[in-house]
Amino acid sequence: EDPVGTDGLVTVRAIIPKGEIHADNLDALAEIAEKYGNQNLYTDNRQNLSIHGVEPKNIEKVKNAIHELGFRTEGFFGIRDIVSCVGTTHCPKAVSGTRNLFDALLKITQESKYDLIQKQGFINITGCPNSCSPYRIADIGFRGMRIRAEEEGAVEGYEMLIGGNEEAHGKKVGDFKSEDIPNIVRDLLDLFLAENLNKETIREFIDRKGLDYVKSKLLYEEIK
């Protein structure tokens, strides 16, 4: 649902994939905010933008205008609202191309079968130990790394944690090649979809079932 303020006016949000927006689209969103909102754009901790002060009668007009720019207005604060740092695209400290993993995981989470669980967890991706996208406190978190493989030598990979939040860091599932992670995430989401109870979060599911049980249900090859 769209947040409603004490004044009865509504906040309409736009999901900004990877937190990156072209200057022309930013200008266009600013024009929408000037016409229908309080003339400001606001950022949030999931790298998205929102327009405050929209009259209820204008909600659909604002959303349609945002959709025409290619941005979604649904799916906030869930598994489809993935956060990633810039990775090797810009950062000299990054060791993994977080953008590619973002695209692969977003494609999976947008499958219709996950509609029922899309509000029950967060996914964060960071390209190095600095954790600019805090992977340790996400339901599903990834930290970029270089890992040794028998034939390829050092390859791009990620440490994967599950079950984290602001109270406790996630538990380590393992270190994996980048190419293997999408299938691992799909297996995890399928398991959660089948066995979660009473709309529990992914973290609550991990706590209830235990890390060993969850790992036993995932098909993967960890890099030792």
What is each PLM-predicted segment?
Residues 13-152:
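Small-residue-enriched alpha-helical segments and adjacent helix-cap loops
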Residues 1-10, 17-40, 181-185, 189-199, ...:
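Long hydrophobic segments that form regular secondary structure
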Residues 118, 197-202:
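Acidic/polar loop patches that form or flank catalytic/metal-binding clefts of enzymes
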Residues 6, 136-198:
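Mobile "lid/hinge" segments at catalytic clefts and subdomain interfaces of large enzymes
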Residues 1-11, 16-19, 52-53, 131, ...:
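Accessory RNA-recognition modules of RNA-modification enzymes
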